[in-house]
Amino acid sequence: MKSHYIVLALASLTFLLCLPVSQSCNKALCASDVSKCLIQELCQCRPGEGNCPCCKECMLCLGALWDECCDCVGMCNPRNYSDTPPTSKSTVEELHEPIPSLFRALTEGDTQLNWNIVSFPVAEELSHHENLVSFLETVNQLHHQNVSVPSNNVHAPFPSDKERMCTVVYFDDCMSIHQCKISCESMGASKYRWFHNACCECIGPECIDYGSKTVKCMNCMF
């Protein structure tokens, strides 16, 4: 039985690696979950005329990644990713129990660790924030915490003597979205952004939105 699963795992990995570049699925985003679903034999069928016995199980297995990864298992039409490179797309999430003091301590001064620390004005972060609703929800939370924020212009800087800075951390190497979340949690980050080329960005407590939309992972740029 164990050898059976090993064979299935190797087969699913080979399947993903052999997809043509022009029509391949987003391997960085999908490989882990697609392999899991293929090993469980939940995505083995193909849609036919009025008959797809495994489609529902496959969709449930892929979960939130269905839209991005259904072409990897032959359930929807292949996409051409040349028009939208993985570095231009990302997944973001708030972490439930951030530790601001830990994050600040780990990002102060120069470090010899495998990451890159980047700081920039909060106003710059807000100038390209991608979701106004998310921002307004954050502003509402900050009001309850008695933090002063601009009330009439989302692009305005914070009214303080020293402009507030947003600090983020980019890990040098590529990693899965699961590992990105764990790594950011372990350093006390408030949020994380996982680019679809597998670059991981941990976002500090001073940031209002979701940090920077620019990939800056040293060994994971494309």
UniProtKB/Swiss-Prot annotation:
Record keyword Glycoprotein present: yes
One biological process term in Gene Ontology: negative regulation of cytokine production
Predominant localisation class: secreted
Phenotype upon loss of function: Embryonic lethality and sirenomelia were observed only in BMP null embryos in which one or two copies of TSG were also missing. When TSG and BMP7 are mutated, the siren phenotype results from the fusion of the limb buds in the ventroposterior midline owing to a paucity of posterior ventral mesoderm.
Subcellular location, record wording: Secreted
Tissues showing expression: Expressed in lymph node, liver, kidney, and lung. Expression in the kidney was stronger in the medulla than in the cortex, particularly in the cells surrounding the medullary tubules. Expressed in growth plate cartilage of long bones, ribs, and digits and to a lesser extent also in the resting zone of the epiphysis, trabecular bone, and vertebral cartilage. Expression seems to be absent from other skeletal tissues including muscle, skin, and fibroblasts.
Pfam families: Tsg, Tsg_N
Record key words, sorted: Developmental protein, Glycoprotein, Secreted, Signal
Family classification: Belongs to the twisted gastrulation protein family.
UniProt free text on domains: The N-terminal domain is sufficient to interact with BMP4.
Functional note: May be involved in dorsoventral axis formation. Seems to antagonize BMP signaling by forming ternary complexes with CHRD and BMPs, thereby preventing BMPs from binding to their receptors. In addition to the anti-BMP function, also has pro-BMP activity, partly mediated by cleavage and degradation of CHRD, which releases BMPs from ternary complexes. May be an important modulator of BMP-regulated cartilage development and chondrocyte differentiation. May play a role in thymocyte development.
Protein name: Twisted gastrulation protein homolog 1
Native source organism of the sequence: Mus musculus (Mouse)
Gene name in the database record: Twsg1
